[in-house]
């Protein structure tokens, strides 16, 4: 599948088994993206040393969302319209998130 097909919206990523497979295929280190996140969270909780923690969801979301946005923007050579279509986000929402992570 080409990027143009993705950007045109003809085949949502969630419906494409080949694209989803790239996210669940182990890396050279043998870990999927899911495995990496799980390992990082286990490591995070193991090193809290009794400190109270809140807002883990937002912490994880920020850690994943920032590199996702940066990588997509690099892939589309800074074209926000293409990036918003590729991500399935409203262009205004994309701009807000890019500003949030100092990527704009």
From Swiss-Prot:
Pfam families: HTH_8. The keyword DNA-binding applies. GO terms for molecular function: sequence-specific DNA binding. Keywords: DNA-binding. The keyword tRNA-binding does not apply. GO terms for biological process: regulation of DNA-templated transcription. Residues 80-99 bind DNA. Belongs to the transcriptional regulatory Fis family. NCBIfam families: PRK00430.1. This is Putative Fis-like DNA-binding protein. It comes from Pseudomonas aeruginosa (strain ATCC 15692 / DSM 22644 / CIP 104116 / JCM 14847 / LMG 12228 / 1C / PRS 101 / PAO1).
């Amino acid at each position: 599948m080409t990027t143009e097909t993705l950007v045109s919206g003809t085949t949502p990523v969630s419906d494409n088994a080949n694209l989803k497979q790239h996210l669940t295929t182990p890396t050279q280190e043998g870990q999927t993206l899911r495995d990496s996140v799980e390992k990082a969270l286990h490591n995070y909780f193991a090193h809290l040393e009794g400190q109270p923690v809140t807002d883990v969801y937002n912490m994880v979301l920020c850690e994943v969302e920032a590199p996702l946005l940066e990588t997509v923007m690099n892939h589309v050579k800074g074209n926000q319209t293409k990036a918003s279509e590729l991500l399935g986000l409203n262009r205004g929402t994309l701009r807000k998130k890019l500003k949030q992570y100092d990527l704009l």
